[in-house]
Amino acid sequence: MQARAIQKNIHVSPRKAKLVCDLIRNKPVTNALSILENTNKKTAVFLKKLLHQAIANATNNHAMQADKLYVYHVVANQGSTLKRTSPRAKGSADLIRKRHTHLEIVLSDDVNERNKEIQAIKDRIKKRAANNKGY
């Protein structure tokens, strides 16, 4: 079973947000919370709030136990970009891109769920290869 939470249009660059996402990927929820507490990045604050929301979704909506949860999937995708200009010499201007991020966290309580998914993908690839042998 999976529970997820999404936060859109956070005023952080996706490149910087991915660094913090990599810290908590595939970790138990308690470890992920302690890592985010001790990470001195702006994104860590947003991810901590989002992780609490995902835990609440898992316990309230899906009746999962909070102590068995782990971070199954966490991603920072590019959101909208605000474009501003900065004046330069001789009447020209540079473009300033103020990037935004969409964060998504998926929690799972089944440790073998990822292995089952990988095995299903491998089976599909084998089946496809067996069908294409004659070509």
Swiss-Prot record:
Pfam name, any one: Ribosomal_L22
Entries under CDD domains matching the protein: Ribosomal_L22 (cd00336)
GO cellular component, one term: cytosolic large ribosomal subunit
Alphabetical list of InterPro entries matching this protein: Ribosomal_uL22, Ribosomal_uL22_bac/chlpt-type, Ribosomal_uL22_bac/org-type, Ribosomal_uL22_CS, Ribosomal_uL22_sf
GO BP annotation list: translation
Keywords for the protein's UniProt record, in alphabetical order: Ribonucleoprotein, Ribosomal protein, RNA-binding, rRNA-binding
Keyword Transcription regulation: no
Presence of the UniProt keyword RNA-binding in the record: yes
Molecular function GO terms recorded: rRNA binding; structural constituent of ribosome
PROSITE patterns given in the database record: RIBOSOMAL_L22
Similarity section: Belongs to the universal ribosomal protein uL22 family.
Matches recorded under HAMAP family: Ribosomal_uL22_B (MF_01331_B)
PANTHER family xref list: CHLOROPLAST 50S RIBOSOMAL PROTEIN L22-RELATED, LARGE RIBOSOMAL SUBUNIT PROTEIN UL22M
Oligomeric and partner information: Part of the 50S ribosomal subunit.
Biological role: This protein binds specifically to 23S rRNA; its binding is stimulated by other ribosomal proteins, e.g. L4, L17, and L20. It is important during the early stages of 50S assembly. It makes multiple contacts with different domains of the 23S rRNA in the assembled 50S subunit and ribosome.
Name recorded for this polypeptide: Large ribosomal subunit protein uL22
Species of provenance: Malacoplasma penetrans (strain HF-2)
Gene: rplV
